[in-house]
From Swiss-Prot:
Its main location: cytoplasm. NCBIfam families: RNAse_H_YqgF. GO terms for cellular component: cytosol. GO terms for molecular function: nuclease activity. Belongs to the YqgF nuclease family. This is Putative pre-16S rRNA nuclease. The keyword Nuclease applies. Pfam families: RuvX. InterPro entries: RNaseH-like_sf, YqgF, YqgF/RNaseH-like_dom, YqgF/RNaseH-like_dom_sf. Keywords: Cytoplasm, Hydrolase, Nuclease, Ribosome biogenesis.
Length: 157
């Protein structure tokens, strides 16, 4: 089930389980995971796969970590309008929702990839390494933002 509201997400998610964060890309998919308390988001891995293989790998991760919900970053232009990538992410999210039967929250991810890259640059991470891990760091930034919104929501407690 695709969800666009944090309140609906909190009602649908199994909050006793970890949450997965995803930064979708055509070539790479970054994956992050929360701790069980939903206070920290940690980069987990980068998936280098296409089409159905991405879905299958995410399903394997969801089963292995007993995931209760998923957060996927939804890209928009800075002015809030949709892009062709926005539509690709929505299509991916729908396919994932049909396969996993978990609540999926689509959240605004404007500037998260840039933030991830800047964070890695500040850590003096070499470009080749940055390119290999920037998507999973972006996924953790996306997930971290949602975790903060969850903690700030009165319905979470």
């Amino acid at each position: 089930m695709i969800i666009n509201s944090i309140i609906e997400f909190l009602q649908a998610a199994d909050i006793k389980k970890q949450i997965l964060g995803i930064d979708f890309g055509e070539k790479k998919v970054g994956v992050a995971i929360s701790n069980i308390e939903h206070t920290v988001a940690m980069p987990l891995q980068t998936i280098f796969a296409t089409n159905q293989d991405r879905i299958n790998k995410i399903q394997e991760i969801a089963v292995a970590y007993n995931i209760g919900a998923i957060v996927i970053g939804l890209p928009f232009k800075l002015d809030g309008t949709e892009t062709s990538q926005t539509h690709r992410v929505k299509d991916f999210a729908n396919k994932l929702a049909n396969k996993l039967l978990l609540p999926i929250f689509l959240c605004d991810e404007r500037l998260t990839s840039k933030a991830a890259n800047n964070l890695l640059k500040m850590g003096n991470i070499k470009r080749k390494v940055r390119n290999a891990i920037d998507d999973r760091v972006a996924a953790s930034i996306i997930l971290e933002g949602t975790l903060k919104r969850m903690q700030n929501s009165k319905s979470y407690f």
